[in-house]
Amino acid sequence: MTRLTLFTSLCLAGTALASIPATAIAAPPGYDKIDTVVVIYAENRSFDNLYGGFPGANGLANLSAGQVRQLDRDGKPLTELPPAWGGLTAKGVTPPVTEAQSAHLGNASFAIDDASGFNEKTSVITRDLWHRFYQEQMQIDAGRNDKFVAWADSGGLVMGHYDGSVLPMWAVAKKYVLADNFFQGAFGGSFLNHFMLACACVPVYPHADTSPVKGQISAVEANGTTLKVADNSPASALGGAPKFVNDGAITPDFYAVNTMQPPYEPSANKPAEGGDKALADPAQPTTLPPQHDITIGDLLSLKGVSWAWYAGAWQATLDGKNATPVPNFQFHHQPFNYFAAYAPGTAARTEHLRDGGMDGAEFIKAIDDGKLPAVSFYKPQGNLNEHGGYADVASGDQHLADVVSHLEKSPQWSHMLVVVTYDENGGFWDHVAPPKADRWGPGNRIPAFIISPYAKMGTVDHTQYDTTSILRFITARYDLPVLSGIVARDKALRNNDQPPMGDLSAALDLSR
């Protein structure tokens, strides 16, 4: 597909190109030393959950009891943590840590892998936790981060953390740069935070109130940030998980903020009977209509910059070989598969949505062969992404470190920037309040690694970043127009007297 054809198709699709500035600011000096940008997107860990003990980072070591203490739903301190409802370990783990065994923990953060406690190492899969748009805002509690337990479905598990020093990526962090002030782009889960990486935008469901999704419109209080609590919800977090009038995927003004399925295969929603086999059934209430916002990929293509999204186990899933627990391909982790510009049959889809291979083999082959495009995004398959409930930390972390090792040996390494981060916190508590910005975020703090021959080696970067900081660097490096969501985030930060988000360059020495 030519740049002109792509531009025309985007306009005809009703995109927001008119809201994107027509010109871009020239790249700052030194940015052109980076020829290859690689973004690796893991899953569902807060900074404190894995890196709260990292030397020099803003972690857990010096926190007072008051900074950790959690409040009940009535605003009073909990006398203890509730048990991990349903058990601390995921279904099928043997021996399990049961709900009863997890009861009566003190009101504090605790080590999941403590040998004198639960002794559940990073190789053990723990249960999943709520990580949803409205609940996260309720947990943050206006920046106090003191109601994570109150508005969780997993009881006290949200306060758990690990000794991250046993992880291979800990050594990578010590060698390169660990960012300890990096926040997920949006409140909530993977679905929305993958859109933040692709377009700094929030998907929409037009006319949701008259569509199959009408039952998923959330019941929200007048403040717009709090779900309406059901009459039969337990008054205390010690009595069980909260219940809501309607905790759906759609906001009252029809934005999709919790998990919806792609309109194109591969999707968790199969094609309609007798319908196009390349399309998910649009009548299913969890199928999101095709989206038309401008993405970072669109802007790169219009500038003639090569790029690709590599999805682990993409082709295997298209071939009907997805399975649980391996590879456990996650359909809603593929943001470009929601956009009309990359619909089945388009040249753009063929060029830019690539198979990362089983266990990342195809992505690693491109690394080893020196054939990565200028900008690459890599999404590991489900069992290697560290998501609670179906993946363990150790396997995913080892995979990340293995990929980094290949990148260090790549023919393209000498002018490469690698960013390894997580999509969101996965429901786990973190003690740092997110900066106040716009309606969508940013959400909680997550680990991020800046890896490059130009990295300020062996340092912790305290610069304020969020997921859009990755897009900011790409935008600056390739002289792209600024996505409207980034413009809006910048304005919101200024309006709330918050510092701007960095573009990752503070972690680099581009004067070499």
Predicted regions span which residues?
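N-terminal pro-sequences and low-complexity stem/linker regions of secreted or lumenal proteins
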Residues: A24-R512
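Gram-negative bacterial Sec-dependent N-terminal signal peptides
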Residues: T2-A24
